[in-house]
From Swiss-Prot:
One GO cellular component term: plasma membrane
Gene: IFNLR1
UniProt keyword annotation of Kinase present: no
All ranges on the Cytoplasmic side of the membrane: 251-567
Membrane-crossing segments per the record: 230-250
Keywords: Antiviral defense, Disulfide bond, Glycoprotein, Membrane, Receptor, Signal, Transmembrane, Transmembrane helix
Subunit structure, as described in the record: Heterodimer with IL10RB.
Record-given protein name: Interferon lambda receptor 1
SUPFAM superfamilies: Fibronectin type III
GO biological process annotation, one example: defense response to virus
UniProt signal peptide: 1-22
Mode of membrane association: Single-pass type I membrane protein
Organism name: Gallus gallus
Disulfide linkage: C74-C82, C86-C149, C193-C215
PANTHER family: INTERFERON LAMBDA RECEPTOR 1, INTERFERON/INTERLEUKIN RECEPTOR
Amino acid sequence: MSAWRIRVLATLCFLWQPRVHGQLPPPQNVTLLSKDFDMILTWTPGEGSPPDVLYTVRYESKTRMDKWIKVPHCRNIHSVSCNLTCVIPNFFIKFRAQVKATSGRFHSPWVKSQFKEYHLDVELAPPLLNVNVKENVIHVNATFPMAICVESLPWMYDFNLWEAGSEDKKQYKSIFRKKAVTIDTTALRGNYCFNARSSIQSIDFKHSKFSQPVCMQLNYEGEWKFPFSATIPVFVLLILLTSASIIWLLKQDAKHKKMPQTLDLSNCKIAGPTFCCELRENEFLTDCLICTDKPMSQGKKNKTLAQNNQMWMASFLPSSSSEEEEEEEEEDSSSFIPYTEMLQFPRKHFNFQTPRTADAETILDSTSGVLSVVGGSTLDLSALGFSFFPIRKNEMDTSGSQGNEKASHSHSSSLGRISLTDVRFPGPREHGQHGTDSNDCLEVSLLHTLMNSSCTRLPADEHCLYKKDHDFTICYQKPTLDQPVQVSENPLLNEDPSMEKFIYLQTLQVAEDEGFASDCDSGNFTEGTPPASTVLSDELRISDMEKRYDKKFKFKGYQHSHYMRRS
């Protein structure tokens, strides 16, 4: 090549070099930095740069030095920064970048940055807290403002919980990015605040700043709720008050109501003799006695018996005072079974009247009374409280004779129980033997004594049943034709065989520790020592009856016979 040609080329190069450098100055302050989980290259335009200047960026890693790789999204850009976060091939290797300015046909030289490692030099941003409030619990999780390419790194967050105005904060640390935290807020009342920060562990834990506090009311409505447990006693109290009010209103309404006239029995009086009875603690009435002057038919006797038992009943509770009485109770443990069959008796030749005698012991109101029978009417025993009549039927005695007639009956009355266990009516032969006797007696053996101060109050002209030594004596005078029969205690009984008679047999059972006064009006009551309480057994022995009781109603032709219980 000739010398002049070399000189021309050198001159042209000299002239061209100063002109280019004068048009595009290089970028200034080229820096590689990390901000909010990103790695960014930043710079500033050179002095005298035209407004339409463009910038191009490329990087190299320390493992492959002198091999610059262009960044696609940072080529001919107008901005003065380039995000290299997702361009970095490895987050654990250091790298650097360079940039130049271009304008038309002119460009500036490359300006390089320092080396940086993402995992060590990254700067973290505070996370965004998501608080989901539910009843008595809250759910807390965090959202990180980062690029998708770096989500695989082990990001964590911490958050604090505290009551507004208080410095006491409860910390929740090292919670992984996708994990939510559940907090029980049952005990929390009022305004509570939350804040959080992100963290990553490299050589040491690296933390971001705390986010701005997020405050909210926890259990705000619960402060004004009425506790459910308190409603139970209130409900019970309301029920009690309502019940008491209803009961009080019913009582007040009942006071203003009057008893119906049909149920008012205060003005009713029972016709017939008055019964006076002074009850003690061990006495109460359970039986009623009705006396009739007519024999009852066979079909009506059971009905009448039930009605009488329902109307007026007297029960006396016996008490044992000795071992002998207890043995008698066990021996006589069976109950009475009364005979209910009745004979039809004639209505003639019987009447009831009450002449007086001088026997003071058997007199009501210090006067005596007797039962007399007058022909032409039926004997009225209602004044003595008798209502049932015994059966009279022919029976064969032990010797085979049929001359004697036997009747036995027992029943409860208001004064107790009277029992005539053995009664024999004299036959025609016996009647002839004792025809001269004018007095007949009916023998009654009492199994129990009457109650003290219990008697039948009769009119002045009627006789009162009385007690002496625990036995009753009912005597009557029987006429031969039309003459009245005197009631007495004579042991003989004269009976007209042409007359059919009735004898009322009744059982009297009272408390064994009570006596009976013969005079209801005198107020003087005699206390007796009663025999032991006994009950009829299946068979009553005559010897036992004679040992226990002395006084008896006797009539002519009387004989003992065993009482057989009806099955």
